[in-house]
Amino acid sequence: MEIYKKGQILSSYCDGEKLSHQSKHLLLELYRCDCEKLNDESFLRCILNRAAKLANATVLNLISNKFEPQGVTAIALLAESHISIHTWPESNYSAVDIFTCGQNMMPELASQYLIESLMAKEHSLRVIERNPPSTVPKQIRTVV
């Protein structure tokens, strides 16, 4: 493993080409959700599994934890990355990450399904296109 110093160009990747991204990271915030659904660990596990399938992803493992007095965290480990959900039923709020890698992934379908399943009356969605080093333009290939 090579260690790079701050400001050093990653010369091994300086081919000047830029390929299209293959990874998307969706950051979804759900507001005014059904508080009972946000506190139902079994329900949340079920919808994460279904969301992964809608995104064309393969679930490798699904773990969850119910907190006292309320709230759940659940994470679906995917062959293509992950989907996670953290809930605050007392605030009718949930934070969701959907990170997928690959050409045939449809994380937007998973996002829409989760919005509907949790009955969110409002939501915020940010999409980040993740780029492996070979897809990053030469001018931004410096280590910060």
Describe the predicted segments one by one.
Residues 1-144:
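Polybasic/polar functional segments that serve as interface/processing modules
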